Amino acid sequence: IREDMVSRGLGDVYKRQMNLTLNDQQQKITGSETIIYHNNSQDKLEYLWLQLDQNKRAQGSDSYKIQTGNIKSLNTRSIKNMEPEFEGGFNITNVTKKDGSKQAYTIHKTMMRINLDKPLLPGTNFTFNVDWWYNINNRMEIGGRSGYEYFEEDDNYLYTIAQFFPRMCVYNDTEGWQNKQFLGSGEFTLPFGDYDVKIAVPTDHVVAATGNLVNANEILSEEQIKRLELAKKNEKEPVFIVNEKEAIKNEKQRKKGMKTWHFKAENVRDFGWASSRKFIWDAMVVKQKSNDVLAMSFYPKEGNPLWEQYSTKTVAHTLKCYSKYTFDYPYPVAISVHSKWIGMEYPMICFNGGRPDEDGTYSKRTKYGMISVIIHEVGHNYFPMIINSDERQWTWMDEGLNTFLQYLTEQEFEKGYPSRRGPAYRIVDYMKGNKKRISPICLLYTSPSPRDTMS
């Protein structure tokens, strides 16, 4: 672990190695991980906590108990969401210590506690392994921040995958463990770490993920490698690594076998990825004073012509504007992935909606809605992915800062951009709304200084 990570006062930092397999026939993920957890706090830790977000969909989950509504709010998705046959949630198959012996643990709903044999002293580390699997949810029917979209016309799946592994909770010096249950609507509190992830997918799939692709020479064709290198030099227009014609050909094939994509990411608080044989892939470089960033997009043909015209250019524009107003983007890539009806962010990668009609036409509302969601979700790389606030407790922190910068970025995209937010008068309708749905901004610090609310 690098000294700069420790010197910033992070309560905990860890290294993680993961091996994942995507079963495209059963829509299932199987994974194993090795976690090296460093206790950088001043406290002895009697146990460690991990987050099991997929247990939100397990039978008996508390998330079902808090959902409210009325007959007027019922729609097809609501009815589908009531169906009990989806068997969601993590299936933890093995937890072991570094030497392979059994590690004691306790699962409580969306949290898992690692019961240590002896306290983990300050400045020491603990290594353990977890094996698991879970069924991927059909996001178009039962919703979710991640899942799959099924394309019936060509019998293909597009996977946008997140919260897919047992994730470390945060331990800080003011509150201890942040182990509030995940009910679905709240977001996340996460520590920084280094990720080494191998993802086995069908051999004809294209994968996008947090971090650098480190085995491109093994999985990409010579032509694709040439295109990728060209994209790293092109600042004006995106370069297609996989174009639409190639993607259409690819989605019609069913090649046998699996291929492993290998990604590494340093100093990130989470990991997300996407996989499909439908993906078109384009990229261009954004040059900064401190480093170059590869802006990329992955999308099915159903996203065109909108996505090939605007997605990657919007990613690049967002990086330039946010970096101008804040700091240079420190990561090597920034990725926009298209799936329908979504807007969700993870380090270096985000999942965005905005789809033309079936005939390829689209309204101004669709166009600007797509551009705005890309700006917003790419912008979340700065808040909270880099400025690491506690989303579970203080959602307004990252959303407020990000929405403000989103407005500035939209106005620089083109003159007269139809921003939904920005000027003060735009908040009036919200403030006049149902008071039961308006949460006050409360600073619930547990010490006189707010220094620990952001890492």
Which residues does each PLM region occupy?
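Early extracytoplasmic/domain-onset interaction patches
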Residues: 2, 11-51
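Hydrophobic helix-coil surface modules that form long, contiguous segments used
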Residues: 166-177, 183-375, 404
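Single conserved hydrophobic/aromatic residue that forms the stacking wall/gate
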Residues: 1-10, 14, 445-455
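A surface-exposed beta-strand-loop module
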Residues: 38, 73-151, 249-255
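Acidic/His/Gly-enriched intrinsically disordered linker/tail segments
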Residues: 399, 403-447, 451, 455
